[in-house]
Regions:
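Residues within the helices of the helix-turn-helix
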Residues: 22-23, 33, 68
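A short, Lys/Arg-rich alpha-helix, primarily the initiator
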Residues: 2-29
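Short, charged recognition helix plus adjacent turn
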Residues: 2-7, 72, 79-96
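Short, basic-rich loop-to-helix N-cap that marks the start of a DNA-contacting helix
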Residues: 29, 53-72
């Protein structure tokens, strides 16, 4: 597993995840609507994930089930979708 990075924030991480979604979708040659439908999502929801935002200024935070559905629709592994070195979650500083 990647090592959490205390200097990184969740907004940056969510945007990188969105970039990975976009790249995988483009590599597959599919539209946002088609991937959204295949993953059981509304097109607007998928668009927000690619932007890395759930609402302006708030990072996207898809459920684990949604991430697996997207990976299945894109024919990729979860490790291909998630950026390395996630930020620390609140409350985990110093925890092992």
């Amino acid at each position: 597993m990647s090592t959490p990075d205390p200097e990184r924030d969740w907004m940056t991480y969510a945007r990188e995840l969105g970039t990975n979604l976009h790249r995988a979708r483009m590599a597959k040659g599919e539209s946002q609507e088609r991937i959204a439908h295949a993953a059981g999502l509304a097109g607007y929801t998928y668009q927000k994930f690619e932007k890395g935002e759930s609402k302006p200024g708030s990072p996207a935070n898809p459920q684990l089930k949604t991430l697996f559905a997207l990976c299945e629709a894109l024919d990729i592994e979860l490790s291909d979708l998630l950026p390395p070195n996630p930020p620390r979650s609140s409350g985990s500083a110093g925890a092992e």
